[in-house]
């Protein structure tokens, strides 16, 4: 009897507060997807992050040109301090296709490199309108994309 009463109370509370729940989460995510596509499309973005420890970790600096056509051009550089006090610098470039999709309830940047590498990076829109990856990297819009 007590279990039945508990279930009835729970059901009544659920029905009572259902209108106050943010039900259209899918619609909100779709708005973010469209916003992030517009934010990235046609712009050059600088991404910086570090892998490894604070002393001998590797710092990455990426300049990514997100073309409105769905293509991207990436110019990357990594920098790492060696045990001997030298700095090891590597430069590379990449290209491929990009899109913003819904992934596990988040807006996410999906890319496929011409080399075949692919990834999905969850993104968020900050209160000031900037877009930020949820991976801990720093991202800043720095100009118009140079697309051919």
Task: Enumerate the predicted regions with their spans.
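Positively charged n-region of N-terminal signal peptides that target proteins for export
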Residues: 1-5, 98
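Bacterial N-terminal signal peptides
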Residues: 8-22
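Low-complexity intrinsically disordered segments
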Residues: 3, 12-13, 26
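Lipid interaction determinants
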Residues: 25-148
């Amino acid at each position: 009897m007590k279990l039945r009463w508990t279930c009835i109370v729970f059901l009544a509370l659920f029905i009572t507060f259902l209108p106050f729940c943010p039900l259209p989460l899918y619609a909100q995510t779709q708005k973010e997807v469209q916003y992030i596509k517009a934010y990235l499309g046609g712009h050059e973005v600088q991404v910086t992050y570090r892998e490894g420890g604070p002393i001998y970790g590797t710092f990455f600096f990426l300049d990514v040109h997100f073309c409105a056509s769905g293509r991207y051009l990436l110019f990357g550089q990594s920098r790492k301090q060696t045990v001997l006090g030298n700095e090891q610098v590597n430069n590379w470039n990449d290209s491929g296709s990009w899109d913003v999709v819904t992934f596990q309830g988040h807006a996410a940047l999906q890319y496929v490199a011409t080399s075949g590498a692919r990834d999905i990076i969850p993104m968020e829109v900050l209160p000031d309108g900037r877009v930020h990856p949820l991976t801990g990297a720093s991202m800043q819009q720095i100009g118009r994309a140079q697309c051919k």
